[in-house]
Amino acid sequence: MSDIDKESLKQNQKQWENEVELGESREANQDDELLMSLGYKPEFTREFSYVSIFGQSFGSMGLCPAMAGSLIFSMNCGGGGMVWSWIIGCICLIPVSISLGELASSMPTSGGLYFWIFTLASPSSRAFLCWVCGYVSVLGYATIYASTVYSASSMVQALAVIGSPSYSPTKYEQYGIYAALLFVISAMTAIPSRVIAKVNIINITFQFLVSIILIIALAAGSDSTTRNSGSFIFGDFTNYSGWSNMGWAFILSFTTPVWVVSGFESSAAVAEESTNAAKAAPFAMISSLGVATILGWCIVITVVATMGHDFNAILGSSLGQPVAQVLVNNVGNKGALGIFSLLVIALCLNCISLLIAASREVFAFCRDGGIPGSRYLRLLTKQKVPLNAILLVLLYSLLVGLLILVNVTAISSVFNLAIIALYIAYSGPLMCRFVYNKFQPGVFYVGKWSKPAALWSLVWMWFMILMLLFPQYQKPNQDEMNWAIVVLGFVMVFCVVYYYLPKIGGKTFFTGPIPTVQQENEYISGVPLNELSLSSLPLPKDFDQKQITE
């Protein structure tokens, strides 16, 4: 190749790089202008691409490890119950992802749910509704994170038992593991957005690999003693629940799918860190749920196909984890130790994604003064990390984790609490959309199917809320009660009392989302006038600056 050709190639490459950079700059400017039109000054750097924001949603599910930690809830009515509750539960959530995706496209802010409800509600009620929704959504995100870390701590203990069968774990040791994981994950999450975006891509790859490894290992390692027939996989409905009614036992099995895939909406929490957020956020919600539905069903079918007929032995296993026992039965202790270790790592990556979403939700609500101490909690580090918000979620998780010291039933109710709080928060803006009819569609909108999808979402979520408030046993004693209603009730009472408290209550200072931008006419293409220069504007390639200077 001649020197002229090389020089021409370099020039073309440089021109292409400049055009890509200019395109990204224009896209970022459009995102920032949309955010400023909603009243907020851009404070995060936009490092999340379509792939990394998909990773945020899909990674928040932690599909395979989350299923491994929660399949015990879907074993209420046999193999068929496990298989069909998963696919039905996930399909019923698709309209929810569409409805929330429309809201995220219309109003792509980290405030998400409580900002949406403020925009869609009436002027007379929107401040109070926004206040309640803010508290409930923060509770939901923080609790789904805490429940996932608890699941990880249970899996760590199962690993210890697999490696040393004589080991007998205690609840105090589990709380110690739980607390240690909280501190480690908090430290791993206090990193800049550009690093988190790369971690999300790693998370996607690792989650898929672990899922494939689990499916192949169980299928290859099973034999005639553990392998089940198709009629058992799809048609066995034996009642193993604490309820006598088979129909209700099947409904209780929905706890697993609604808990596992609950992270699909977390892309809205990082909308202010995403490029082309109005399209990317709904894309991540819907596509991640679709992938999880199919891949998760394959995992459930494989587990049921290789777990044998003796459910009682698996449920009563000393490992405390059904999937761990299924692995031991099929691939032996050493194989189970290796594969289950991968599941624990995958679940920790899942926890990172969940803490990212929870901390952004806390930051956004504190930016609007919703939580006591917001002046400090909303601060960002020099690297644009909401460290104080992360620490608040850490403190809450340490406190709610004390339920470990009560009993397994008490801490298991945290799984229910997470979904209940999130579903209440999800349903708020959808209800306001029907009542006040103020919704303005964004670039993602399904037209005539929009309202039916929103209506179905409300029906399904409130049905699930009622189901999750029930205890695991038909006639529970004090130790078997569902603690979800206790924690939820405490938070609801606190936020309502704090709002109406004379002189210092939220009603005296909280008016909803607080605009943080300068006046609209002080911005051009997302740049403040006092910082404006030709180099800061997305000018065409053939623009000649001499035309102005001359």
From Swiss-Prot:
Keywords in alphabetical order: Amino-acid transport, Membrane, Transmembrane, Transmembrane helix, Transport
Span list, region Disordered: 1-24
One term under GO cellular component: membrane
GO annotation (BP), single: amino acid transmembrane transport
Major localisation: membrane
Membrane topology value: Multi-pass membrane protein
Subcellular compartments: Membrane
InterPro entries on file: AA/rel_permease1, Amino_acid_permease_CS
Transmembrane segments: 53-73, 78-98, 127-147, 177-197, 201-221, 246-266, 283-303, 336-356, 386-406, 411-431, 453-473, 481-501
GO molecular function, one term: amino acid transmembrane transporter activity
Gene3D superfamilies: Amino acid/polyamine transporter I
Source superkingdom: Eukaryota
Similarity comment text for this entry: Belongs to the amino acid-polyamine-organocation (APC) superfamily.
Name used for this protein in its record: Uncharacterized amino-acid permease C11D3.08c
Species per Swiss-Prot/TrEMBL record: Schizosaccharomyces pombe (strain 972 / ATCC 24843)
